[in-house]
Curated annotation (Swiss-Prot):
Its EC number is 2.7.8.39. Its main location: membrane. This is Archaetidylinositol phosphate synthase. It is found in: Cell membrane.
């Protein structure tokens, strides 16, 4: 089990119930948090250009936090639903695309951004397809959404001070994302051959 999977397990067992209890008093509808996540991600784009890169980073962090709590609120309030699951996975892809647009605005080369984004969209597709075929795909591969999100935040933060270092990190992240695509494809194909 990877570091982020252990952190996710710790978060879901120890932190999420407390956070969900608090947030359910603000709004018990988990879809509010799901919808707010891409709004914060979209606000990060003009924030980078017209306010400050730090404000943009904070908005992306808020977007990621909102995405991390919507499921916890749904479980805490007993409002887990197919609609919520559909909205969450769909809006996550929109948020991911907006995070990558911010990378482009920050000066990351367009080809690197495209490589990161395209691989980052294929990874969750492979999970969804694998799970629709009855396989457990969560936790397979180096760069799941948590790792990709941390990488994007790090690249953006570093780009403020040293764009060349950020470009090197983004290139490495793109390679790792595509390694994850290959890992998942190999795993799913291997399981389906059995």
């Amino acid at each position: 089990m990877g570091v982020f999977n252990r952190l996710r397990s710790f978060y879901e067992a120890r932190i999420a119930p407390t956070v969900a209890s608090f947030l359910s008093r603000i709004s018990p509808d988990p879809n509010i948090y799901t919808l707010a996540s891409p709004v914060a991600a979209a606000a990060a784009l003009p924030a980078w250009l017209y306010i400050s890169p730090v404000a943009s980073l904070l908005l992306i962090a808020l977007s990621l936090l909102l995405d991390a709590v919507d499921g916890a609120v749904a479980r805490f309030t007993g409002r887990v639903s197919p609609l919520g699951s559909f909205l969450d996975s769909s809006l996550d892809r929109i948020s991911d695309s907006l995070y990558h647009a911010t990378l482009y605005i920050a000066g990351v080369h367009p080809l690197i951004v495209i490589a990161m984004l395209s691989g980052g969209l294929i990874v969750p597709y492979l999970r969804a397809k694998g799970e629709s075929l009855g396989l457990e795909v969560r936790g397979r591969g180096l760069m799941e959404r948590g790792e990709r999100s941390i990488a994007i935040l790090a690249i953006l933060a570093i780009s403020i001070y040293n764009l060349q270092t950020a470009l090197a990190l983004a290139s490495a992240a793109a390679v790792l994302v595509w390694i994850t695509v290959i890992q998942r494809m190999v795993y799913i194909a291997g399981e389906l051959r059995r």
